[in-house]
């Protein structure tokens, strides 16, 4: 494999001049630049980026943690991150935690051992005191998750307001008994969403029952289970605000299968505005989340920190959400 030394000797220039051409440095004459580029092409020279990054103490790589790549929300988040890192000449490693605390800590070891320049956490499995010691090794950013103790940049959306908006929509449709679904019970983001649900009920002098609240619901099969729990209740909710569109689709599927009319017998709101909302019959009313932009913004902020142009001190960036009204309500 040819080296910079060989290119320099062939062109009768210094190694510094060759390096400047490789790095697109402006202070090289056009004549010398063309000569060096021709030699590089003839010798089929390929720069050793690994060695270069080692000298710079940078990997040009960011890690992204998600619980599962087959969930549509996180697939979109990965898409947003991947597009932006390519545009910025970085690479991304996607790490699945499967909602496991130890797996998340193993991801953070990549930062400690300088295998990545920064980490974007798409979920948060551990308490912050388990995460914060790794900040001395490089930047960490929370995306789609919150923690009150995290003294770093957090990019997400207003979970409280999104839930409040959805529940008020159901109330305005005439519903007085409204259920609620969420996924991880220890997530502060999910807690904020639940608070939005409860505040909407309170503001309209409505009450809820504990059996109308369903936790750890993630996918279509969980939606099946939610419906059957609702069906077996003596005092059923007439509407339900779900944690994501997959759960909403599962509820609707089983409701229709069991002779329920949606929304007449059971109104359903999803969350995320996934494509499944437009495939299911009836189509699903949902909360639209700018997931692609969420990923893009996370990349921009963490690269700013990696480059030394900005710190990731405590700040919360909230992207806008909106209610998309369809047939299920």
Swiss-Prot record:
Entry annotated with the keyword Repressor: yes
Function: Positively regulates the ntdABC operon and negatively regulates its own transcription. Binds to NTD to induce ntdABC transcription.
InterPro entries: HTH_LacI, LacI/GalR-like_sensor, Lambda_DNA-bd_dom_sf, Peripla_BP_I
Domain HTH lacI-type: 2-56
PROSITE patterns xref list: HTH_LACI_2
Residues within the DNA-binding region(s): 4-23
SUPFAM superfamilies hit by this protein: lambda repressor-like DNA-binding domains, Periplasmic binding protein-like I
Any GO BP annotation: regulation of DNA-templated transcription
Keywords of the record: Activator, DNA-binding, Repressor, Transcription, Transcription regulation
Keyword Membrane carried by entry: no
Protein name (Swiss-Prot/TrEMBL): NTD biosynthesis operon regulator NtdR
GO MF terms, alphabetically ordered: DNA-binding transcription factor activity; transcription cis-regulatory region binding
Gene designation per UniProt: ntdR
């Amino acid at each position: 494999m040819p080296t910079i030394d060989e290119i320099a000797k062939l062109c009768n220039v210094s190694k510094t001049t060759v390096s400047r051409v490789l790095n697109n440095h402006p202070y090289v004459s056009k004549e010398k630049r063309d000569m060096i580029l021709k030699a590089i092409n003839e010798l089929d020279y390929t720069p050793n980026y690994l060695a270069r990054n080692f000298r710079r103490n940078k990997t040009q790589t960011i890690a992204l943690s998600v619980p599962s790549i087959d969930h549509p929300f996180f697939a979109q988040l990965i898409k947003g991150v991947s597009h932006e890192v390519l545009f910025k000449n970085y690479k991304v490693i996607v790490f699945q935690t499967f909602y496991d605390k130890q797996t998340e800590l193993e991801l953070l070891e990549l930062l400690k051992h300088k295998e990545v320049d920064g980490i974007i956490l798409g979920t948060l499995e551990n308490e912050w005191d388990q995460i914060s010691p790794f900040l001395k090794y490089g930047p960490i950013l929370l995306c789609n998750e919150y923690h009150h103790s995290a003294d770093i940049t957090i990019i997400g959306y207003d979970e409280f307001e999104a839930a409040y908006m959805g529940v008020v929509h159901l109330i305005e449709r005439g519903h007085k008994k409204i259920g609620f679904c969420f996924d991880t019970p220890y997530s502060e983001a999910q807690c904020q969403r639940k608070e939005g649900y409860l505040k909407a009920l309170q503001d309209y002098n409505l009450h809820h029952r504990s059996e109308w609240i369903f936790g750890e619901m993630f996918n279509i099969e969980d939606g099946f289970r939610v419906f059957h729990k609702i069906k077996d209740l003596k005092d059923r909710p007439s509407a339900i605000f779900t944690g994501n569109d997959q759960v909403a689709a599962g509820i609707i599927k089983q409701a229709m299968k069991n002779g329920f009319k949606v929304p007449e017998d059971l109104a359903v709101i999803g969350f995320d505005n996934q494509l499944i909302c437009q495939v299911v019959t009836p189509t699903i009313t949902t909360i639209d989340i700018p997931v692609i932009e969420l990923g893009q913004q996370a990349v921009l902020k963490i690269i700013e920190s990696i480059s030394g142009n900005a710190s990731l001190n405590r700040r919360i960036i909230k992207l806008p959400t909106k209610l998309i009204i369809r047939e299920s309500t």
